[in-house]
Amino acid sequence: DYKLHKLGYKLIDPSVIFGLPIELLAKTFDGKFHTSPNTAMKSLWLNGDINDMRLNVMARTKVLKTYVTINNIAVAFVAIHNAIAMVHALEVSKINQRQGFGKKIMQQIAGWASLNGAHYLSVITVHNNFPAKSLYEHLKMSEVGNYHYRIKL
């Protein structure tokens, strides 16, 4: 990282990784799980901060995965590898934020992941996404790591 910095690569998207043992969150399992996203889910993502490139990465994922929604108000993607469920692209519609949908979808994900062999739940967000960080901290998830990208200027 230091060498990249010295070569003129700029730090972008500093991120924090949260995690917890899945049994601490897996309480329910009644969400709508899909093998591919429906039109409403894609629309919610595209109106948020998830672009087509990210959606294509999700589609190409080769491990056990699912797309989850709560009435197309909240959506997320989760994939399991080595008993770790990694949540990606959690999005709650702007008008429905701060109403508990983030917590509910994370519980749904944990329930699905637990039934599919995961023992640990993890999620990554950029450092300045304070609503997401607040949700994960409220869920008693611990900060377990950090990372960032670098790009050449």
Task: Label every PLM stretch briefly.
Residues 1, 123-133, 150-153:
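Conserved beta-strand-loop-alpha-helix junction that forms the acyl-donor binding cleft
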Residues 1-35, 150-152:
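Acyl-donor-binding surface of acyltransferase catalytic domains
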Residues 13, 72-74, 145:
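A structural microfeature
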Residues 36-64:
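Internal catalytic-core helix/loop-beta-alpha segment
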Residues 56-94:
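A conserved beta-strand-loop-helix scaffold within acyl/acetyltransferase catalytic domains
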Residues 92, 98-111, 115, 134, ...:
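Conserved acetyl-CoA-binding loop-helix of GNAT-fold acetyltransferases
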